[in-house]
Amino acid sequence: MKFKYGAIVFSGLLGVSAILAACGARGKFNQVDDGKIKLASSLTSRSASTALQKVVEKYNKVKGVNDYPIEITQIAGGYDGGRTDLQTRVNVKDTTNFYNLILNYPDLVSTLGRVGMELPFDKVKTDKLADRFLDFNNRISAISKKGIYGIPVSLSTEVLSINGPVLHYILNSAQGKVSSVTSVQRTADSGSGTTNNNGVTKPLKIDKENESTKKLWEEIENKAKENGKKTSSSRRKRNLSSSKQMSTQTQPTDNSNDANQSDQAIEKTWGKYQEVEGGLKDYTFKASVFENWHDLLDFSNRVAKSFSNINTNTNKKGTDIQGVLGIDSTPNSLFTSVFAAGGGNYDNFFYKVANGRADFSNFKNKGTSYQNLQKVYGDYKGLIDSNGLFVNKGGSYSSNFQKFHQLAYSISSTSGFFYSFAGENSKRLKFDGGNFIEFPGFTQAIYAPENNSQSGGESGDQTTNNEANLLGTFKIKSSNKSKSSSSKSSTKAETGKTSGGDQNQGKKGEGAQNQGKKGEGAQNQGKNGGVETTIYLYKNSIPSGKNKGENAILIDNKTIVEQLESAAKKEDKKSGESTTEQTQIQSKSVTEQKQPKIIGYTTTGNVHEDNKHIFPIDKLTSDRNFDRKIIVGATEETLDKSNTLQSNEAIVLPAPSKYKSTDTNKVTITQGPNIIGIHVNEKENAETQKFVDWFLNSPQTWEGKGKGKEQTNKTAAEFFAESASYILPLKEIFEQKNEKKEGSDQKDSKSNGRGKQTNLYTEKALELFRGISTDQIVSYSDQVTLGVVVSVME
């Protein structure tokens, strides 16, 4: 393998701010004083958006009489959309509709700096924040005057999340210990725990002499047993329901065979282990493979070679095994690897910042960073060639697949804990061709019109025109506390008898993409006991008596109309059965009462329209800032728990902190949106700094979440970070070695439908950030690695 240097930019991985900064263009301009502070937000997470709105409302309530109020300017398209919007306004010198603040990544400071539009927070007290999380300001290109230009108000890092049951199957099968279906049944009946080698001649060895490896293997076994319990329980319930005689039989009470049951379930999708050269044949497994990139990629490559369902599948469908290792952020993983290979020293990285300018001579002259990239790429290429690497394709996050046992482990943001695991009833929507999306939160089923009962007319009016124009209906529940259609009320996600609230919020599987970065877990909309409202979907026109945006939506997309009408006309398999297919292991008896026919779904969850199955439609007034979509041509599928990953079956480790085990320094990425100031005019600049100082330093009273929750007293910055599963890098947090920060480790049970869970990702993030704050770990920030012209690998 060799490198060929060329003028190819890592499109999508790196920006152009540093290159533009090198041109030295200046063009500072003032904006019109409009008497208010505008905060630009492109947050896609409901929890973060809701928290930010509450912060704005709080400030406007407690601010001084003469202080400028603050309002949110919503920008579509996630952080990339926010970046594009800011660059456009800078380029056209927008003096009337620009904003004062933006929540985004600090590379935007370079964009502002090249035209002198950056705003230093020299009137804001930042002494409560740990210094190590502010020093990236010294490495921002296009900024010559030292100062604080970006304040990290919502930090996250990355973790390695291991699917315990899947990894157990991989290691156990490579040891020759995975029993066949018949032998598993026989050992269960006899009480024997014996296994066979299944033709494995040189089995994998687990280095149990190493204490860390021994401990990890025991943990992996326990996770497999947890998964096996679900399988055993499901089978016993099925047997009991199908035969009264079975109810009197003695069932096994120990869990000695649960791990085998788990392996058997995983084998159905992963296939059988193949003993091949360069695979896991005669391989010695150690816990240290997860501590450095070189060994992790090598081990992953060996696993991929050992399973034909991975290495021979060149046309993966959404329901297939996607690989061994999943990576949500390609630039994060690639550049962190290279940074670690350079000893965690920016002098050995792609660029150096001197006097506000980025110097890329180290890379251009084929120096240390070039050589390190060459080594790192070689490791990645091996895994790519064996088809074992899954990368996020515009929103198809690893957790979408890992929670369905389609990956062995993945590297993802700590802000995504409540996205990463399946609920009690794990549902997804399948499309033709094997593609799917996880069942989004904030979703309602659309029902076909019932003849002679749902015309949409006023007071029972059932005119022919109204009946012909009615496509379907769905129901929403408004909170009892709702004061008006535009108030803080929200809708309860529901489809038939099941709720989408316990599912994660709309992350797209293979085929259609999700918007924005991966963010925080979904929150359940609405409350029990709310007022139920029927919403009518019409084509052509909305009849009198119905109000657009209140209880009616007009569908003018012909494809949607045709799909809804086609679904409504389809013959049911049985009279009274929904066309939705429920693939449930624990089946329920079919009700004799006629059920309404489901012909589609509508959601305000964060799913991306593909204009094939998912389309944008008009939203309701109660949807507030969240866009509504319609989903057609989907089949709902409910999976057995043994086919899904629960949080208690995962092993959460730090993402690899070294390139090779012999490296001296550990490296951890720090990421997350900063609050960034923009020059407007003298008066508004002062008002902007006043708000930011209040945001960071003024404790306020906040209502607790859920029944019985007490009010809390904290700053707006703390409230925002904790509400969104982020971490505010306060010195006091890192000094509390084993204490849990209120709100950051627990999530209200309504936000995920699975009761209270310890946020394993946040706990790991706090551990890593403490290491950074005490200089035990080197922090890497990708947000200022911009405009690098790099080579093509060949």
UniProtKB/Swiss-Prot annotation:
Chain segments annotated as coiled-coil in the UniProt record: none
Compositional bias ranges of the Basic and acidic residues kind: 567-576, 737-751
Membrane topology: Lipid-anchor
Keywords: Cell membrane, Lipoprotein, Membrane, Palmitate, Signal
Renumbered residue ranges of the record's region Disordered: 182-208, 222-261, 474-529, 566-594, 737-757
Entry superkingdom: Bacteria
PROSITE patterns: PROKAR_LIPOPROTEIN (PS51257)
Compositional bias per record (Polar residues), positions renumbered to this chain: 182-200, 245-261, 511-526, 577-593
GO cellular component labels: plasma membrane
Residue numbers with lipid attached (N-palmitoyl cysteine): C23
Signal peptide (UniProt feature, chain positions): 1-22
Biased composition range(s): Low complexity: 475-501
InterPro entries documented for this protein: Lipoprotein_10_C, Mycoplasma_lipoprotein_cen_dom
Record has Cell membrane as a keyword: yes
Record's subcellular location: Cell membrane
Pfam families (alphabetical): Lipoprotein_10, Lipoprotein_X
Lipidation (S-diacylglycerol cysteine): C23
Similarity comment: family membership: Belongs to the MG185/MG260 family.
Name listed for the protein in its UniProt record: Uncharacterized lipoprotein MPN_152
Lineage: Bacteria, Bacillati, Mycoplasmatota, Mycoplasmoidales, Mycoplasmoidaceae
